[in-house]
Amino acid sequence: MTQRIALVTGGSRGLGKNAALKLAAKGTDILLTYHSNRQAALDVVAEIEKKGVKAAALALNVGDSTTFDAFASEVAQVLAQKWGRTTFDYLLNNAGIGLNAPFAETSEAQFDELMNIQFKGPFFLTQRLLPLLQDGGRILNVSSGLARFALPGYAAYAAMKGAMEVLTRYQAKELGGRGISVNIIAPGAIETDFGGGEVRDNAEVNRHIAAQTALGL
């Protein structure tokens, strides 16, 4: 059986790092991306390799679609050199940023940055990577609980996640002919450094979230 390979964007920290480590623990090889902290990515690669699987890291700015052709070429090169393959099996579109700003105060620049990273980026990155994704492969996109309920200060961020949910349904329909399944997960609040560690480090935000949670945890 061919060894499975997962490409995890934003895999050097937070949810992406955790996902990469969990996949590696189940025997999946990992190709992860990082935005700027190469050392953090290499540390994750080393941690993954200790689990007995292969791993590699590539730089990627998900917010700059002009770099995607070059990135796809890099992926193809790494697949050939490290795995002797022309395709990978799983794509996790995880990389992203957060924004806490009231609707009335959200700037066009903030909106555009979110759009580029949270929606346009995954849209066109996935498109560019389709020739490298194995038939019968899997794509997993990431939404948020904020697309299910309204929490003041997250209008722009939640709108992008809502867009990703619609996109996921269309991808599933259009890629099904290749046996590729496309799904999306919508995590709740997680204590990572995402969004500057707002959930983890801001006591007021923590209390507010706990107040909305059944067990208050």
Spans of model-derived segments:
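Alpha-helical segment proximal to the catalytic Tyr-Lys
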Residues: 131, 173-174
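Active-site helix of classical SDR
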Residues: 126, 160, 168
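Substrate-binding pocket helix/loop in short-chain dehydrogenase/reductase
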Residues: 102-103, 107-115, 205, 209
